[in-house]
């Protein structure tokens, strides 16, 4: 079964999807005139401006909800796995995917506001399934349904539950004697309390926890890097050289081809920042704003924070400490990097980070999956989705690590495909709206 899933994963994240994913970002970057560089200062400025418009939560809360789902195990374990399998060069391709992904995320945020609607309870509803249907017309309904089905699968079987819970249980088991079953049970109880509270409950947790945990984690990685500051030039050089040339086996590292570096860097980058996946615009649609371009700019900062800052710091921490060439993998690899500076406190410190990161990711993805489920079946059966989601959180503590990440990659690909098609079809709308806004 595992070998079959690996074959499907290799096909799903083969050249066609990678080209479509990065190609969409490159195309939007060119058509928008390097907007992710030239308008980045304004984007950060907009985050803290008072919101004026229709919506359910503030733009800052919407961004934090999106970051809650992106700043998760992908930043700690995903980066470690990418480097372990694809070599240091995977970090470079993660940067490239994030840079062009910022333009993709901008387009997603813009379209989320332009084509949002309201559900049967009066709450704002938006995201790819809505901009496919409202922006592209009824004939594209099958594509909207495909996205929504994939979104539910990702939430229940991928990023939303299994990868996060598995990472939490493994990390806690590595640092304590608590069994995965007990951890998963306790976690499912806390998740149930939060998810049955709805979006505002999730946003409240996100706006409180996300900024704090991100700042503390950044300080932790900077401390490790500072103690290895002399190795930075050589590490950066290794990242660039191994991005374009095969890397031989060394120690516990099995070696990596350029294709492996690209595939793992891009796939793990998407897993972490979700640019092109179509999840972030579901949160963006709830923002209290009537200006699509401004929400697009705010959404764009999520990819910058998640990958170009947090993932980069994780990658450098693993590389400068030299643990990447050992026998460890996953969370144990990053824990080992932290322990080189923080001694036996390192694994415990990272476990705290991981639990907070993963918990908020679970909450964010519950909301995404819920909106996709609602699009398919209406608000009447949301309670059923929430019950199944909590059960999947519980089950996540019993699934093998390798299978967890492979399943997550496969369902990610299913979700990204319809969204990327929609972004390309609706790109003229994005370009017209952008020009109209900046020509005011």
Locations of the language-model features?
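N-terminal alpha-helical transmembrane segments of multi-pass membrane transport
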Residues: 1-73, 83-90, 101, 394, ...
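Helix-loop-helix module between adjacent transmembrane segments
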Residues: 24, 28-29, 97-122, 129, ...
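Alpha-helical membrane segments and immediately flanking helix-loop junctions
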Residues: 53-85, 111-114, 120-135, 146-149, ...
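Extracellular loop-to-transmembrane helix junctions
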Residues: 9-42, 84-122, 143, 305-313, ...
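Membrane-interface loop-to-helix entry segments
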Residues: 20-27, 31, 35-44, 165-172, ...
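Transmembrane helix-loop junctions in multi-pass membrane proteins
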Residues: 17, 32-36, 74-79, 155-169, ...
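Flexible loop linkers connecting adjacent transmembrane helices
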Residues: 34-58, 81-83, 87-91, 95, ...
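Extracellular/periplasmic helix-exit of transmembrane alpha-helices
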Residues: 29, 108-116, 120, 222-238, ...
């Amino acid at each position: 079964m595992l070998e079959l899933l690996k074959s499907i994963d290799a096909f799903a994240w083969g050249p066609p999807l990678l080209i479509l994913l990065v190609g969409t970002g490159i195309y939007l970057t060119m058509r928008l005139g390097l907007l992710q560089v030239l308008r980045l200062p304004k984007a950060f400025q907009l985050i803290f401006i008072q919101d004026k418009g229709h919506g359910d939560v503030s733009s800052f809360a919407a961004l934090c909800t999106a970051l809650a789902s992106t700043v998760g195990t992908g930043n700690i374990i995903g980066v470690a796995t990418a480097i372990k399998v694809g070599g240091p060069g995977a970090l470079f391709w993660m940067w490239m995917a994030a840079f062009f992904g910022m333009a993709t995320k901008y387009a997603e945020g813009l379209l989320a506001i332009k084509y949002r609607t309201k559900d049967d309870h009066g709450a704002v509803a938006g995201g790819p399934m809505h901009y496919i249907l409202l922006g592209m017309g009824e004939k594209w309904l099958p594509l909207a349904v495909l996205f929504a089905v994939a979104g539910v699968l990702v939430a229940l079987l991928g990023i939303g539950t299994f990868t996060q819970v598995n990472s939490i249980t493994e990390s806690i088991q590595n640092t304590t004697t608590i069994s995965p079953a007990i951890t998963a049970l306790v976690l499912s109880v806390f998740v149930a309390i939060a998810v049955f509270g709805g979006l505002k409950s999730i946003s409240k947790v996100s706006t409180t926890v996300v900024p704090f945990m991100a700042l503390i984690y950044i300080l932790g990685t900077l401390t490790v890097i500072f103690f290895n500051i002399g190795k930075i030039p050589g590490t950066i050089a290794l990242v660039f050289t191994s991005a374009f040339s095969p890397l031989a086996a060394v120690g516990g590292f099995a070696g990596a081809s350029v294709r492996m570096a690209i595939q793992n860097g891009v796939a793990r980058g998407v897993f972490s920042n979700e640019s092109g996946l179509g999840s972030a615009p579901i949160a963006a649609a709830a923002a209290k704003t009537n200006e699509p371009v401004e929400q697009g700019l705010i959404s764009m900062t999520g990819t910058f924070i998640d990958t170009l800052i947090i993932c980069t710091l994780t990658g450098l921490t693993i590389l400068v400490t030299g643990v990447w060439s050992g026998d460890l993998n996953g969370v144990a690899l990053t824990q080992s990097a932290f322990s080189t500076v923080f001694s036996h406190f390192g694994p415990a410190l990272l476990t705290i980070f991981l639990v907070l990161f993963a918990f908020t990711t679970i909450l964010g993805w519950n909301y995404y999956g819920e909106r996709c489920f609602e699009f398919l079946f209406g608000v009447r059966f949301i309670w059923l989705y929430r019950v199944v989601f909590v059960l999947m959180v519980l089950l996540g503590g019993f699934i093998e690590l390798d299978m967890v990440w492979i399943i997550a990659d496969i369902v990610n690909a299913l979700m990204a495909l319809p969204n990327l098609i929609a972004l390309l079809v609706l790109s003229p709308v994005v370009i017209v709206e952008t020009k109209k806004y900046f020509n005011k």
